[in-house]
């Protein structure tokens, strides 16, 4: 990693008053400090309408969906809107070649037709409590601290029973979560209702919900109907409960009214949701590490993975269903890394962070605070010290563990090997291996694709990048013995009992201890896992001193700026952000408007490119201009719009509300130029990409003919 400093640029940035430009993402309890500015942009709400700790507010209608997305309640029957890509896994699990809901969409026309989704959870925040004093008191009592407890969600949440009482903490259907903010300088507890009976109600075809797919991802203008619809169910008393046929639709204490009157450039926009991760307090060296190691390796290895997957998906519909979710997930992180690196280079984000760093150091020096400079030096030392380890770790993670499925093959433990002659223990061990095999050899895995393409391509590149002496022993010895990654992979699939179901079942009929222990795929997986654990431990040695230094550095920033003026980094907790509906100029001579229409869908149509196929029914509606009440005043059909709000991953599915707190859209993406907003908000370039609620309603009504949902939502025209 190259360390580069730019003294001339630094002076220019310092003189430009760039210190922590802040577009959000604000904590709910910071609402009072933002209301005046929000009203200056046109908002007509009061603070208590958005967040009221003593009553209902918009906060109560915004949910966390499936641990990493956001959703919004829009009826008194627990109807929930989120993005198509947020519900993608559930849609995929219900899909088959015979009932391909990914391709054709899914529409339930009664409650009885709604589909159950085991394992899916939705959370609603009930209370938010400042527990900083209590947490710091408990942290002081730790007898053998690891040095990271002050940031650990698991450890922090384990303190909840001491804070709220053991009886309260054991309430069925509730979860208490304590998280660190500002690098561990503040702590808040979130009391949540957890719903586990969440049913799929509707989803458009992927040709609508994923229109433009990976080519348009992170891009504006956009033309995507990115939504899916679910419903929360509760027991007959209205409490969260596990699935039961006796459960009834949940009646929330608050839902958001839907406004179908349309939007215009300059309108106020409010977004609430669960942004995942940002890095606004990074030092310059941390930006360099993120770009040159994390992002560069992700771009390289996922590019190889995705090229192979896409080629195979286009050739076989069965493979397409099998790998659809994996490909979408990989592509999302890939393009995010590309966009972040573009912003770091073109928008000089490293230099901006260097300027901010110097500003904090100058402030601390003036105040006589020596710990700030010590913290910056400690951060740089940790980054430099872990450079080679982190590089090896990232190649192993992106290239092997996340890319090659056989790294998840079953591993025979010492218990079955040592007690093979004990029939009971041998059988128990074999059943454990069967369970591992079933988890590994699921419907989302193709041995043929793995053997012939994926494993060879990724393992070849990994071996080119990592010196042999630093590779997992199975990879090092296998490539040396067989002459190439290709020959090594072919040997594994030729000999492993896990290479096919037939071979596995044959082994289970006549199990052999030596064959089990010598299995090449199992040894590959065990060797990779060992190397991963070894690297994780070595990298982790830098975690505690780095976290302590970051905490000290952020404490100085917090003291300098003051908490009311400084939003903390995102960490999957409920936030709000606000701005206006507005286009932008990404580069010279290029200007983008704020809204897109169905006309743009037809302009992009390409029957020979799966990303831009237009459903015949949608095309017929377009040709007839059969838009009903959902059209713009000029007769065009709205699809998407963009706003200056500050969002990131986790905000997918976030409600976008107007000046009166009425739903006008669903956030689903960011523009390419704004991905760097995870480090520094860039108001002239950063845009949230939003599904216009009228397009969602139009698809439900005119495309699907699902009148019961329109009747339930009761949009205001």
From Swiss-Prot:
Give yes or no: UniProt keyword Protease: yes
Pfam families the UniProt entry points to = Peptidase_S46 (PF10459)
Q: How does activity depend on pH?
A: Optimum pH is 7.0.
Q: Molecular function (GO) terms listed?
A: dipeptidyl-peptidase activity; serine-type aminopeptidase activity
**Mutating residue 670 to D: what's the consequence?**
Loss of catalytic activity
Q: Name one GO cellular component term.
A: cell surface
Cite the SUPFAM superfamilies for this sequence: Trypsin-like serine proteases
Disulfide bond positions: none
Q: What does this protein do?
A: Catalyzes the removal of dipeptides from the N-terminus of oligopeptides. Shows a strict specificity for acidic residues (Asp or Glu) in the P1 position, and has a hydrophobic residue preference at the P2 position. Is likely involved in amino acid metabolism and bacterial growth/survival of asaccharolytic P.endodontalis, that utilizes amino acids from extracellular proteinaceous nutrients as energy and carbon sources.
Query: Which family would the database say this protein is a member of?
Result: Belongs to the peptidase S46 family.
This chain's protein is named Asp/Glu-specific dipeptidyl-peptidase
